[in-house]
From Swiss-Prot:
It is a multi-pass membrane protein. One of its GO terms (cellular component) is plasma membrane. This is Olfactory receptor 5M1. The gene is OR5M1. Residues 1-25, 76-99, 161-196, 259-271 are extracellular. Odorant receptor. GO terms for molecular function: G protein-coupled receptor activity; odorant binding; olfactory receptor activity.
Amino acid sequence: MFSPNHTIVTEFILLGLTDDPVLEKILFGVFLAIYLITLAGNLCMILLIRTNSHLQTPMYFFLGHLSFVDICYSSNVTPNMLHNFLSEQKTISYAGCFTQCLLFIALVITEFYILASMALDRYVAICSPLHYSSRMSKNICVCLVTIPYMYGFLSGFSQSLLTFHLSFCGSLEINHFYCADPPLIMLACSDTRVKKMAMFVVAGFNLSSSLFIILLSYLFIFAAIFRIRSAEGRHKAFSTCASHLTIVTLFYGTLFCMYVRPPSEKSVEESKITAVFYTFLSPMLNPLIYSLRNTDVILAMQQMIRGKSFHKIAV
């Protein structure tokens, strides 16, 4: 950054979760295990969806993209974090910090609207089952994932530009384990009012708008389920939504604790703990939640283990 009072910033220092060398080695093992489980679980989910003919439906199409986003999401932060656990120089380049910040915002927003698309899919499946094939056609499904990717990356790029347009001086120590907006803003020595307002508006809008779509979809879904006379029918209809509802609750619950508030020293410290959950645990748990609660996925896994599901990969 250019300023008459300081030199160009070329790198930042990530303070991470702790400065205790012994604890860092323990955390390295813990987060490495979480990362490997995340990669294995989500890659397995993508492989199952692409190779098993019974999973070639809109619901699993969206789930495959959710798994892909979770892999990118975790991979954006974890490798650098693991490196810093074992390194004395806990630095990240200016370009690397910009990229990490951009990808983090972009992938979070993308996941918002993929989860919203999944809710719409469940709404159509339960409330309009006779029109499901036409209303959730391949073209519509492609649009429902393409738009979140495009919008997410445009939002991430614009928000990152606002952040890195700020002048940074004095300490360049980021009080976090990745390049997050709130602690970066606290390092700035230029006016941050526009950036703070933009962050609050964008985070608030995307959280509330995507959650509104999900809640409205489930309002109609529950109304339709309660009209089903048989208990078995109600249970079967609700079971198709249970995994998605669990993921939505975990993901949105933690994010609401972090971004819908102005940045402060206290909020940054709290957000580090919150961020551990949705950056590492949520991507690891998502495929497990769908696997344990979904008979189609369990059956597909059994078929894959027996070597019966490796047909031609669907395009």
